[in-house]
Amino acid sequence: MAQQRGVNSLQFNQDQSCFCCAMETGVRIYNVEPLMEKGHLDHEQVGSIALCSMLHRSNLLAVVGGGVNPKFSEISVLIWDDAREVRDPKDKLVLEFTFTKPVLAVRMRHDKIIIILKNRIYVYSFPDNPVKLFEFDTRDNPKGLCDLCPSLEKQLLVFPGHKCGSLQLVDLSNTKPGTSSAPFTINAHQSEIACLALNQPGSVVASASRKGTLIRLFDTTTRDKLVELRRGTDPATLYCINFSHDSSFLCASSDKGTVHIFALKDTKLNRRSALARVGKVGPVIGQYVDSQWSLANFTVPAECACICAFGKNTSKNVNSVIAICVDGTFHKYVFTPDGNCNREAFDVYLDICDDDDF
């Protein structure tokens, strides 16, 4: 279904107020609440696009070619400035970063751009007169896993470490350009990292392994494990992990077609295994019992990749989660601390017309 609609990838901006859609027909930019298309780059301008990344709600967009009819190479990141007034639309391409291998992901903040390849990560100053500040060798990272703290106070970068199942954290503000920083590693899982995310302040990192049954949260300063959340018992591929803006909740989506919502601020809201009330159990069962299960969940099309994030709070006791799927569907659910979860909105974002420039 994703191929029918031609969606190659989806990504939220830094505060999850917008998302960009890389397509066989170009790029579309959407506002989340209310849902509306804010702009697009058509196929004549950019060809088919594999990846796109937004810088907050600005006019700057990073694109990487790919798909069936690309105009641009998969080894280049192009920066598109939609606010630039030019006669030829091609002149809106203001920057280009080119490498020797395919670009797998791009992350941006107000002063830096991060470009992720399979075995290397590059950090440049951005957007004025970009200069390469750092490069980091990584273990095989075929999904281009990486997250960057958007906070003005903290310049934290996280990506899979050299050791299987580990996370590497780099404070870009404490690292001198051209030098390699001392490794700051968290041994998070026994198998390969499959998904990771930082909260908005960069104080907590969440990760899941390829097994996909557990999500573990760590303090980025002390490296201590804070909590272990159980998505389920069957292996799954996690597509996305996101924190609420105040880090009170966490949501996660997987190929099981379920979006799980966990409480972080008040973990007593999360469900526990019935065995937790039994008392002492063996070490293997004990790990299962000690885990916290989601306080609420909802379903989206199974095996359809989707990204999820928290919406605007409608009241003190009502929160919302947005799920955006590559099949073109938009889902909004509201949930309460007692675990009630109900659909509030459903739409097909690919059928929404252009509203404005972005």
From Swiss-Prot:
Motif L/FRRG motif per record, residues: 229-232
A Pfam family recorded for this sequence: PROPPIN
InterPro entries, sorted: PROPPIN (IPR048720), WD40/YVTN_repeat-like_dom_sf (IPR015943), WD40_repeat_dom_sf (IPR036322), WD40_rpt (IPR001680)
Domain of life of the organism encoding this protein: Eukaryota
Keyword Repeat attributed: yes
Major localization listed first in the record, in broad terms: other
Keyword Membrane found: no
Organism of provenance: Danio rerio (Zebrafish)
Protein name listed in UniProt: WD repeat domain phosphoinositide-interacting protein 4
GO biological process: autophagosome assembly; autophagy of mitochondrion; cellular response to starvation; glycophagy; nucleophagy; pexophagy; positive regulation of autophagosome assembly; protein localization to phagophore assembly site
Record's subcellular location: Preautophagosomal structure
UniProt family annotation: Belongs to the WD repeat PROPPIN family.
Keywords: Autophagy, Lipid-binding, Repeat, WD repeat
Function: Component of the autophagy machinery that controls the major intracellular degradation process by which cytoplasmic materials are packaged into autophagosomes and delivered to lysosomes for degradation. Binds phosphatidylinositol 3-phosphate (PtdIns3P).
GO CC terms of this entry: cytosol; phagophore assembly site; phagophore assembly site membrane
WD repeats: 2-40, 188-228, 233-272
Domain-level remarks: The L/FRRG motif is required for recruitment to PtdIns3P.
Listed GO MF terms: phosphatidylinositol phosphate binding; phosphatidylinositol-3,5-bisphosphate binding; phosphatidylinositol-3-phosphate binding; protein-macromolecule adaptor activity
